Amino acid sequence: MPMPKRASVDDYFAQLEDVQRPHLEDLRRMSLVAAPGAREELKWNLPVYVVDKNTNLWMLQNFTKHCSLRFSPDFFATQKAAVEAAGFDSGAGFVKLPYDRELPTDLLESLMQARLSDHEASTADQV
């Protein structure tokens, strides 16, 4: 079944299924706290947290039985071992978060902070 077209980030969250809503709303809150200067933008029909002109920090994705917090594959490769050590499945750039498990907030906040540090280091190299 194709994903419904969303008009905005708020519309994305409004269209979530009941089982999806708690995890994704928690991820949204965590994202806004971790990166207060980031903009929420709808890209690829999904919420993306963006800084500077167009740097994507991370993206939220919803699926039938899980959601994902997605980063660039290059960045996530440096974090994948910590995700797997915490007992969560991962792939090329994402941590898989089943709806029937509690969100690993410490792990997710750590990933977000690491991505922000990675971004700050990359922009410092350009100066």
Describe the predicted segments one by one.
Residues 1-127:
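Charge-dense, helix-prone N-terminal extensions
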